[in-house]
Each structure stands twice: as C-alpha cells, then as structure tokens.
C-alpha cells in the first residue's frame, strides 16, 4: 500500500552494524575466524542479572529480560580464551580495528573524538558472558547524500560483536564464543529519513562506503541494519536485525501501516470506553476440553478485554493481527502464545467452552477474552504481560524494540533501552585516536568508473568485480599483467559457475587464482583450461597451479599440433564437409573442442578449422 509519508510525518533513522576484517578481536589476541558448534572443545553455563548504572538506575529493557528465568550455555573453542569467558580482564583496544574504524569515519565525513572512552552497555539476553557489551564512541557529526536529500550521521561507535546464538531451547539459549569480541562498527544516522526508498538508499550508500575500505567482513550475518521508525501521533519503534537491504523499504512501509492501524484501534477503543480486567484462573472451564494444547497445560489464565470484540483479530501488518502482538508478549515469558475469542471456537475449543469462558470472566458481547495455557508460573506472568499490552493498545502505539521478520513484518522483542544501560569500562584505558595519517580509499563507485574507462570492462562486469569479494585479487592480477577481461570474467563468473556445480571454491586461495590467471597470460594454459584447472586445485589445494595443469592434462599445445587435430576431425567427416562446406563448421567445432578442450584456445581452433574447411570446399 502507498502512503503520503509527508502527511503522516514519517521520521526514520538507521543503525548499521558491520564486522571489521581484522586479524584479532577487539580486546584480546584471539583470531576473528568463525567456527562450527561441533568444533567446540568445552562448554559452561551462566545466569545473568541486570546491574544498576553509575547513577543507580536499572535499564527497563534489561529488567524485562531478567524476568525471564533462563540458563545460558556457552561453547568455547581452541581459538577463544578467558577474555571471552569474562574470566580475564580485557586487553587494550586493538590498533588495527581502531585504524579501520577511523578510515570509515573519514568516509562518512565524521569528526573523530579527541579521546575515546570504552563504555559498558548492559545486555542480559545472554549474548555477552559479562552481561554487558564494550562500546566506544569514536566519531560524530557526519553526512551522506541520497537522491532525496542529505542524511546526517549522528555517531559511529567501535564495539565488540556479541556471541552467536546457536540454539534456543526450553530452559535457555546456547551461544558460541567464536563471534564474541569481533570488532564491529555501529553507525547511527539522525532521524532525517522521510520515505522507505530513502531509508534503503541511505543503507546502500553506507554499505558501499564500508566495503570501499576492503577491510570489512563479507557474508551472511556480518552486517546488520536496525531501522528506527515513527509517524506523527505514533511512537519510536526500533526494528533490529534486518539482514538484507532489499527488506528495508518493505519493513518501513509495513511499520507505518502497523502504527496507522494501532492508532485507529486505539481511537475505536477509547470511543468504546475500553478497559482491561484482572487476570483469572479459568482452568476449570477447560477440564474436559478436546483442545490438545489446553488439555496438556497445568494452568489456564484468562483476562477480559472490555470493548475489544472484533479488534483483537484485526490485521495490522500482513498476516499479523493485534492478537499477534498480544501473543508476542506472552511468548516473551515462556508461553507458546495465546487464544482469543475473536478466533474461537477453533483449535479444539467448543462453542460451549467459549460461552463458559465468557461467563467465568464476566465478558459480554462487546468484549473479547484472551487466555494463556501453560505451566502455572508461566501462565501467570504471561497473562500479566498480555494485559499490560492490551492496556497500551487503548493508549496508541508503544515505544519498543522489534525484530525484523523475513517477510518485511516485525515482532515484539523488548522495551526500548534507555541511557541507564551505559556506564564506563574501568578495565580498559581511554585512547586518543589520531586520524591525521588516514588516507581515504577509492570509493567502489569510483572504482567501477575506472574499470570501465581505464581497463575496458563493460558496466555490468565492472560493477560485479568492484563490489565482489575478489576485488583485491583482481587488482593484483591486473598489476601482474593479466588481461583485465580474463581476470574479471574468471573472478566474477567462472567461480560462480564452479560453485553452482558443487566445486569446493572455498578451498581456492588468492594465490591459486592468481597463478592460474598468470599461466593463461603466459600462454601456458588456454582460457578453456581455467575451469578444469581450478576444479583440480579445489579438489587438492596442496597442488601448485602448474602441478594442477599437468595433473589435469591441460598443458597448452602448439599451433601445428592443433592443426593436426583439426585435420584429423575433418578427414573423419570428409563426406559431410564435401556436402555442406562451411555449413559443417558448427558440428565439427564441437568435435574439435571435445578433443582439444583445456589444451588449445577456442579462437585458435576456430581459425584453423575455418582454414581447413575452406581448403576443401
């Protein structure tokens, strides 16, 4: 659906989180490589609790998280140490990470601070063993351009990445320490964004600047976008964990729609003098129920929602309703979700049970009833959370942190964090960053233009190479005299083809690729031999390029040997050549290449085949 965003007063901002590609982590000497859970050498468990800030305040988001009793298990590896486990003080801030972050700050036109103080940001969802994340304000007051106007950069922080969530189970969560401590920059814009398309363009621009350094990690999960959205009369909502730039405009548009619907629901509820009753134990109502979910529960708690009839089931985002919002809050406290009378009778709940439920809580026809079926403790806390969210629905749109879903919608996570979650880190001394020696890199957009004008690549191939992960290999290959088009085609297309054919491309080192390209340039390997040579190297990475060429029988042959092979093919097909002349070319070319593939350049084969056919035509 299209909206008049100016009329609605849309205000949006971004937070971009990007991992840096450094040798070691931010506060220890462990490598930044990722590991598989089965590679863990041991595990340990922790319980986390919120602590007060230096002003004696508790952060609301941390406090809510702590109300959910969960055990956190951590997987340790032979590439992690006691710093990640919070059993050893952090080391000094990593110099490589600091230098890369300052380079990014320069590209964002930010001012680097005179002194950077490491802070502790309270996080009790288990993703940090210490219960806090170390974060450093490094730069402020930048700006980027978009087609719809400038977007100011509020700040850029250098911080440690959280632990990787491996598995969530009934009692808690399992995390991997391999990701914890990887250097990360967090870039926050000011609320200058006014449309969903501008939000996406701003994110793309920041992403391009980050990749221009050549010093950020690539791949799924290495960059995350958070989007802050509000409309006039609505509320600020932070949506976390957007993995793809393609999702940003849909996410913003759907959040605008959600807030519009919630405001309309709130107005209707106030017109109905809506209210929320007290939760009640209604377990007896369902003693003989045929609903499997309810029958298996220890306790059933319900709450009357005065004036809510027909509104709990109202859609506020694609396939998500007000009831889904209530359910999200119940789930945060361990329940599987909720039932509500806008969708009952259903799920094994009979009409008679619905009427008995209404009688038990004193609901009339204008009211709705929500219920939770779970263990006693869970049911009691979950129904309280549902009641609180229903109270908020009467007021309008709540400020909150939400998680981005893959379909462009979002789900409730927790309240918005406040300033009470930050306090100084006393184990790490402040640093005085000096950006005077920073030399800003060539932007990827400029690199694309140069590849076209100086190296003769077409626009599509130039962009593929410039934005691709093998851009540094391409630059080195060209510096070593390799033909740019050959290098670009190999790195942008050939490797993709091999990956689709299930070749273990990840086994190929940069030197493998460069050596194969140099053999082609030297005439020791025809272009048709690139694929089989790389396949051989991927199967056995211990080989050199020269050894792989020899093992695969790909060594180039001289022109006369090619001619002999061509003549042999023609003589085998003499009748066809006599009857069709050059019309036989295509079929004979395929036969020749089948015999010479990987040993002779296709252009040479084609040239000699034409010559020999013409002699006989």
Swiss-Prot record:
It comes from the Archaea. InterPro entries: Asn/Gln-tRNA_amidoTrfase_suB/E, Asn/Gln-tRNA_Trfase_suB/E_cat, Asn/Gln_amidotransferase, Asn/Gln_tRNA_amidoTrase-B-like, GAD-like_sf, GAD_dom, GatB_C_1, GatB_Yqey_C_2. Keywords: ATP-binding, Ligase, Nucleotide-binding, Protein biosynthesis. Gene3D superfamilies: 1.10.10.410, GAD-like domain, GatB domain, N-terminal subdomain. Disulfide bonds: none annotated. The keyword Endoplasmic reticulum does not apply. Pfam families: GAD (PF02938), GatB_N (PF02934), GatB_Yqey (PF02637). GO terms for molecular function: aminoacyl-tRNA ligase activity; ATP binding; glutaminyl-tRNA synthase (glutamine-hydrolyzing) activity. GO terms for biological process: glutaminyl-tRNAGln biosynthesis via transamidation; translation. PROSITE patterns: GATB. One of its GO terms (cellular component) is cytoplasm. The keyword ATP-binding applies. It catalyses: L-glutamyl-tRNA(Gln) + L-glutamine + ATP + H2O = L-glutaminyl-tRNA(Gln) + L-glutamate + ADP + phosphate + H(+). Its EC number is 6.3.5.-. Coiled coil: none annotated. Belongs to the GatB/GatE family. GatE subfamily. Allows the formation of correctly charged Gln-tRNA(Gln) through the transamidation of misacylated Glu-tRNA(Gln) in organisms which lack glutaminyl-tRNA synthetase. The reaction takes place in the presence of glutamine and ATP through an activated gamma-phospho-Glu-tRNA(Gln). The GatDE system is specific for glutamate and does not act on aspartate. Heterodimer of GatD and GatE. This is Glutamyl-tRNA(Gln) amidotransferase subunit E. The lineage of its organism: Archaea, Methanobacteriati, Methanobacteriota, Stenosarchaea group, Halobacteria.
